[in-house]
Each structure stands twice: as structure tokens, then as C-alpha cells.
């Protein structure tokens, strides 16, 4: 009898707690999670889904893959009443744009506010998983697309070797051992040993397909599954993430946001500035998008700045040294308008990049590169802080945007307009008049992005960081 009374009291206080949490002062509790809201979640059997991406993928792509897997985890927990599924966060090791190639093994909390993630889905850092189970998983899976017979409705289960063997660095290393197979994990962080391996071939590798595969696998007595090459999973629609409360759970940690906000407050001293991501090193070789010469890009940024009555241009770039040389040589009289973030605190290059992203995120207008994931992540964040209007997020435009035979790139934009602002042109006249007619037309061409690719709601998690924006 006492046990029943205690149980009833437990439920009573749980209900009271959830009612209190819907007050406006605690908006964060309005997130209707699918595991903390279950009173018996602590009694469920713990299952783990590990994943990684192609070796050497960039930071922003790896960040994006998290959304794909988080939706899988969300749906698994929503359906299952017996098990609770944890997403194992792979450590950050080898990342393409980092100078330090190996030996990082950084936790996600080094960059992100993981407490926010935990409010919606169960997560665990790989370091914690390894303490529990070592570098072992029960089964690893991969996927490949059926390209020759798209109408095929069923999927195929193939030997693991028939998936991308070069990406997986897979080998069978001990036929008589319980964990027979071995594969590289999360760049060059470590290797994972597994008992079984399978390759699934299908014409639509969506998060629903992967969820279904995992549901079937966990019917057996297993604890963990490793998903290799999870970049194969299709990008979810924005509304799928929104309906699952997942679209805004990847927020940078307080330390990095503070660095960015302090720079805006103490150095820029205004929120009315424009920002731009100028990417050059590897984008010089993208035939579909011709990046403009640095001096052309800088004059276009000045033009946009004067049109919008701003006085500051913040630039994030992989060619910062070269850009500053051009400014000193050709734009000396406009030098006071250009700002760059300097790594005075000797931060990790991943941290430095995040701070640049946040400064760009909070700007009045952002000018990016439509093919860059760095740009895409800034635009995503901007839409979450009510800076998603079409005139606030502009693309620099391909240098050949005005060529008649470049219709393909034109179709990548929501709209393209030619703006001739006499007042703004007068302020750059001494340089503008020396450019060719082709370059003048490019400077006057403004490209606008599609808004449907991004969320359209204001994030409650970001509210405290943008009070003055």
C-alpha cells in the first residue's frame, strides 16, 4: 500500500513540474521531448547508435549529419516503449580544414552546448561510451543506392565489402574472434571492432529507411549499431526537424558565443554591420561557381555596405592574409570599414571558425557563397534569430552570373536583381570608374537565396544571446 501511495505522489509531482514549466519565464520547457517526458524512461534498456562520416569531411558537414541521425534517434524513441536509444557522438579528429590532422579526439561539448541536445534526444559522447563498452559494437552497417533499377521497391542486404570499401577501410581481422571485423572510426580517432557487418542497398536512403533497419536489428539481443558513411542518409526536410523540435538544438557553447558577442560589443560597437564569407582556396576549382577576384569582391561588399547605410564590413575567409594585402594596396582609403577576427586567445581553429560564424550570424546583412556549408550554417543560424528575410541574406554571386549561357547557376537563386544606387556608387566612384563594364555590372548584381531551405521560427535557445540584435 505504501508503495502505491509513493508511486501516486511521484506522478503527481511530475505533473505539477510539467505544468509549472509552461510558464513564459521558462519557455525552454515547451520542448515536448520524447524520452524525459516518459516517467519510466529510466527503466528502459539502453541501446546505442554510433555513426561517422567519410574520412576527412569538413566540420560543417559533420555538424549537418548530426541532424540526420538525431531525427532517426527521435523517431526510434518515439515508437519504442521498451528501449531507450542514445546517439553516440563521434569525437572530432581528422577534419579537412584543420591544420592538425590527427590526435584531436575532441568532445562535442568543446564546441557545442550539449545540454540543449539532451533536452530532446538522448546523447552520449564516444569517450563515455568507450568507458562502458570499449571500442566495440555489435554490428556495423552501411548503405548504397540502387541506381540501375530505381523502381525496385525492396532493399537488398549485401556483404559489407560491397559498400564503399575505400571509405570504410574495412578488414576482417579475426575469423575465430567474437568481434571479427574492424573499421576506422570518426576520421582517424580509433578503430571499432564488431561482430557482424552488413551493407543495405536501396533507392532511397532516408532517415525513415534507416530507422526501420535499426528497429529490425534491435529486435535481436544487441546493444549497439555503428552506421558507417552516414552521409548517404538523405537530408531531412526542414519541417521534419521542426516538428521533432530538432532544428535548433545545435547551439555553440557559452564560451564561444561570449567571445563573439564581446567582439561585437567592444570592437564593432554596433549591430548594424554587414558580414561576408569569402572562400577562395578550394573554391577556385569549382567550375559551376566562379569566385570573383578579391578586389572585385571587396568593392561589391563596399557597394552593398553603402546601399544599406552601414559603416562596417566583417569578413570571415580562408584567404585573410591575401585579402588584407589587397585592402592595403587598392582600398587604403576604405581600410577603416573592414574588420577581421584575430585569434589573440590562441583558440583551436575549430573554435575560431565558430566565433567567426557567430559574428556573421548576428550581422544586419550577410553575404555568403551558395555552395559553401560554412555559409549554409550561418544562414541556418540567422533564420533561428529572426534574420531570415530575403534582403538580409545575399549571395556574392558567381563571377559569370551575367553570362547568357550560365542559366544553370541563375536557377540556383530565388531572384537576381540589378541595383544602381547613385548615392552608393558615388562613394566608390574613384575605384568603380576604373573597372570594366562587365565588372561594373557584376558589382551591381544582387543574388537572393531561397528561404524554403531554412527554418522560419525563432529559437528559444538563442534568445538570451541576441537581446540587443
UniProtKB/Swiss-Prot annotation:
Binding of GDP-beta-L-fucose, residues: 56-60, 277-279, 373-374
MF annotations from Gene Ontology: peptide-O-fucosyltransferase activity
Signal peptide: 1-18
Site (Essential for catalytic activity): 381
Gene3D superfamilies registered for this protein in UniProt: 3.40.50.11340, 3.40.50.11350
Catalytic residues as annotated in Swiss-Prot or TrEMBL: 57
Summary of the knockout phenotype: In S.stephensi mosquito vector, development into ookinete is normal; however, the number of oocysts developing at the basal lamina of the mosquito midgut is reduced resulting in 45-55% fewer sporozoites in the mosquito salivary glands. In sporozoites, cell traversal activity, invasion of host hepatocytes and gliding motility are severely reduced. Also, TRAP, but not CSP, protein levels are reduced and TRAP localization to the cell membrane is impaired. Development in host erythrocytes and gametogenesis are normal.
Keywords attached to this entry: Carbohydrate metabolism, Endoplasmic reticulum, Fucose metabolism, Signal, Transferase
Subcellular locations according to the entry: Endoplasmic reticulum
Catalysed reactions, as listed in the record: L-seryl-[protein] + GDP-beta-L-fucose = 3-O-(alpha-L-fucosyl)-L-seryl-[protein] + GDP + H(+); L-threonyl-[protein] + GDP-beta-L-fucose = 3-O-(alpha-L-fucosyl)-L-threonyl-[protein] + GDP + H(+)
Documented EC number(s): 2.4.1.221
One GO BP annotation of this record: fucose metabolic process
Enzyme class: transferase
Function as written in the Swiss-Prot or TrEMBL entry: Catalyzes the reaction that attaches fucose through an O-glycosidic linkage to a conserved serine or threonine residue in the consensus sequence C1-X-X-S/T-C2 of thrombospondin type I repeats (TSRs) where C1 and C2 are the first and second cysteines of the repeat, respectively. O-fucosylates sporozoite proteins CSP and TRAP. O-fucosylation regulates stability and intracellular trafficking of TRAP but not of CSP.
PANTHER family according to UniProt: GDP-FUCOSE PROTEIN O-FUCOSYLTRANSFERASE 2
Protein name: GDP-fucose protein O-fucosyltransferase 2
Lineage, top ranks: Eukaryota, Sar, Alveolata, Apicomplexa, Aconoidasida
Gene name tied to this protein: POFUT2
